[in-house]
């Protein structure tokens, strides 16, 4: 029988392809077209319960419910919209956890920033998510649901997906890749419009390349490595987990990934005022990028509670960028969005959890 993604003791249909759902219907003693109907209602009509799929025989719907099979949609807990129309959603899982996702609109695109885990074990000093540690990894349906929920809430088709929300995607690599397959095949978001971010996990980049090729064929999504420092000492200060992954080893693995996939790597660099944004740091970063098929994305820090890091001035950001450009580094500056509504990753979720504890 078709293996279904598991939610505790329940099975979720969200995340299955049309072919999988056709096979599922046949195994249930139904015609294969019933599987195609389920697929349409889940991915195009946004069905949230089996009972809402009125084209299915009621007897079969009731039977599926008795078996514990469900669509696997999340429940909205809270939504916040910033002045620039950036949307932040908090959604509840079957086991009472909270997932955070963000919709970032511009005139021509809608980017969904999805979470891959509930919490995060990496402990990056600038990140609100890591303050609470890791609870668990997300299932495929819980990842895909984030994109569908943003689409429904904003009444607009997402064009891009970035795995830059809560969690370390490479610690949930199989579900992330299955989610990418679903996003491309079932929701219609091209692989080139998807970015997977990682802080760097030893001995995983080659595995990612090989697994992605096995699951997706040719790798077309973008790998974004969260570098955030141009030397090992400073990187360990900002990212404690970097102590087990020397920066030279990380860059060596990135070059191997490029060889295996033919895709350039994007390096994320969060600018922390007075800490890693000086001219010498730009020079060191340019030296690291020499000979790399890569791109550097600069991000001005969004302050969070409990940390004393500062957001650099716009003039400092511009000077850092210009130094890199003058050294021949391909560089861009990410526009800050939703700063008036707890935009830093994990902030709204942490505040909500704190309120629940207080009450």
Swiss-Prot record:
S-adenosyl-L-methionine binds at residues 167-168, 197, 226-228, 302. CDD domains: Radical_SAM (cd01335). InterPro entries: Aldolase_TIM (IPR013785), Methyltransferase_A (IPR040072), RlmN_N (IPR048641), RNA_MTrfase_RlmN (IPR027492), rRNA_lsu_MTrfase_RlmN/Cfr (IPR004383), rSAM (IPR007197). The keyword Iron applies. Keywords: 4Fe-4S, Cytoplasm, Disulfide bond, Iron, Iron-sulfur, Metal-binding, Methyltransferase, rRNA processing, S-adenosyl-L-methionine, Transferase, tRNA processing. Disulfide bonds join 113-345. [4Fe-4S] cluster binds at residues 120, 124, 127. The active site is at 100 (proton acceptor), 345 (s-methylcysteine intermediate). Its EC number is 2.1.1.192. One of its GO terms (molecular function) is metal ion binding. GO terms for cellular component: cytoplasm. Residues 106-340 form the Radical SAM core domain. Pfam families: Radical_SAM, RlmN_N. It is found in: Cytoplasm. Binds 1 [4Fe-4S] cluster. The cluster is coordinated with 3 cysteines and an exchangeable S-adenosyl-L-methionine. Specifically methylates position 2 of adenine 2503 in 23S rRNA and position 2 of adenine 37 in tRNAs. Reaction proceeds by a ping-pong mechanism involving intermediate methylation of a conserved cysteine residue. NCBIfam families: rRNA_mod_RlmN. This is Probable dual-specificity RNA methyltransferase RlmN. It comes from Prochlorococcus marinus (strain NATL2A).
